[in-house]
């Protein structure tokens, strides 16, 4: 019957989801516990550049907060 395809469909769905989830965890691990940010728009790029300058270590994913602002 039609429901015999469900196990194969479930396996295929899991195989398609694993790379996306694994990529998110790898980015989170390599970027100091934060997810990877992408500056596709000019505004996002400016925010990343601002965070890079404010961090004090030239990395956008290291946040130091307000104590670094002069």
Curated annotation (Swiss-Prot):
InterPro entries: NADH_Ub_cplx-1_asu_su-1 (IPR017384). Belongs to the complex I NDUFA1 subunit family. It comes from Cricetulus griseus (Chinese hamster). Accessory subunit of the mitochondrial membrane respiratory chain NADH dehydrogenase (Complex I), that is believed not to be involved in catalysis. Complex I functions in the transfer of electrons from NADH to the respiratory chain. The immediate electron acceptor for the enzyme is believed to be ubiquinone. Its main location: mitochondrion. The gene is NDUFA1. Coiled coil: none annotated. This is NADH dehydrogenase [ubiquinone] 1 alpha subcomplex subunit 1. The chain crosses the membrane at residues 1-21. It comes from the Eukaryota. It is a single-pass membrane protein. One of its GO terms (cellular component) is respiratory chain complex I. The keyword Electron transport applies. Keywords: Electron transport, Membrane, Mitochondrion, Mitochondrion inner membrane, Respiratory chain, Transmembrane, Transmembrane helix, Transport. Complex I is composed of 45 different subunits. It is found in: Mitochondrion inner membrane.
């Amino acid at each position: 019957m039609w429901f015999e395809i469900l196990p194969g469909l479930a396996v295929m769905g899991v195989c398609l989801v694993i790379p996306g989830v694994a990529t998110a965890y790898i980015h989170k691990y390599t970027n100091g516990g934060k997810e990877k940010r992408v500056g596709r728009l000019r505004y996002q790029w400016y925010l990343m550049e601002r965070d890079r300058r404010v961090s004090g270590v030239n990395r956008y994913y290291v946040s130091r907060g307000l104590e670094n602002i002069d």
